[in-house]
């Protein structure tokens, strides 16, 4: 079992700028990618343009039953 990368554990971070960009962050509490408004600068690396990219990087791999 692999855990998501450290960047997926970061909180959402709007940043100090005033843009209103729709982005997605990985919520490690709910294990889901959730939308937030990004200001356009600074912030952190838990910031994805699409839910698909967020899930590809951060979603834990599904357990496969090998029985």
Swiss-Prot record:
Glycosylation sites: 27
SUPFAM superfamilies: BPTI-like
One function term, GO molecular function aspect: serine-type endopeptidase inhibitor activity
SMART domains in alphabetical order: KU
Domain named BPTI/Kunitz inhibitor: residues: 8-58
Alphabetical UniProt keywords: Disulfide bond, Glycoprotein, Protease inhibitor, Secreted, Serine protease inhibitor
Main localization, broad class: secreted
Annotated disulfide bonds: 8-58, 17-41, 33-54
PANTHER family referenced in this protein's UniProt entry, alphabetically: COLOSTRUM TRYPSIN INHIBITOR, KUNITZ-TYPE PROTEASE INHIBITOR-RELATED
Protein name (database record): Colostrum trypsin inhibitor
